[in-house]
Design a protein with these regions (language model features):
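Glyoxalase I/VOC metalloenzyme domain signal
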Residues: 1-74, 89-143, 150-206
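RNA-recognition motif
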Residues: 77-79
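Short, small/polar residue-rich loop motifs at catalytic or cofactor-binding pockets
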Residues: 81-83
Length: 206
């Protein structure tokens, strides 16, 4: 089962602006849609998409566009053990990670996205892994604290909620709706309340 796109929910008066942000600042019109939220939400929503570029220069350029469009820095971009990256809060309140595996440029920046990963913060990685395998997903990487599935253009990954919040640099507390719907080949709700749909009415980021 492949993920076709993710749908982020926001207040009805911010749908068009949020769609423009993902389209113009991040270039994600194909894989991110936006719709009006129907349930309240506060604090950390439990998930964090991760946008991975090939070159660190693309990380800098994307962050610059995001901040100019109203995003707020959570972690400034910097070199780390894993590469080069940081995190920011989108205008709709979604926490994003942005990174490159390359700490220094190996070629000129081109804007090439290597992959988009949807990181879900879960209560039990083991239980959630089993649940998603029962839905037909295949684990491509599997560790006690992290699992990544082969799910098409948008990769699905599982991480403990508190660990994900720490990695992003945000307070783990939060309540209410996740304000997220995953559009794929099945309709279900996972053990942590993340909704999956086969089709829906959305306003696309494109």
């Amino acid at each position: 089962m492949n993920i076709q796109r993710i749908t982020i929910e926001t207040s009805s008066d911010a749908v068009q602006a949020a769609g423009a942000f993902y389209r113009d600042a991040l270039g994600l019109a194909e894989h991110v849609a936006v719709r009006a939220a129907s349930e309240p939400s506060s604090g950390f929503r439990g998930f964090a998409p991760s946008l991975i570029f090939v070159q660190p220069g693309d990380v800098d350029a994307a962050v610059e566009r995001a901040l100019a469009a109203g995003a707020k820095v959570i972690k400034p971009v910097a070199k780390s053990l894993w590469g080069y990256g940081g995190s920011f809060l989108a205008p709709d309140g979604t926490a994003w990670q942005i990174a490159s595996a390359n700490k220094t440029a190996t070629a000129p920046a081109t804007g090439e996205v290597e992959r988009l990963v949807l990181l879900l913060g879960v209560d039990s990685v083991k239980a959630s892994k089993r649940f998603y395998q029962e839905q037909g997903l295949t684990a491509a990487k599997s560790f006690p604290s992290y699992v990544e599935f082969d799910s098409g253009d948008v990769k699905l990954a599982l991480y403990k909620r508190a660990s994900l919040a720490k990695q992003v640099g945000i307070d783990p507390s939060g309540s209410g709706s996740h304000r997220l719907a995953v559009v794929a080949g099945g309709t279900f709700t996972d053990p942590d309340g993340y909704a999956w749909l086969t089709a829906e009415s959305t306003v696309h980021a494109g």
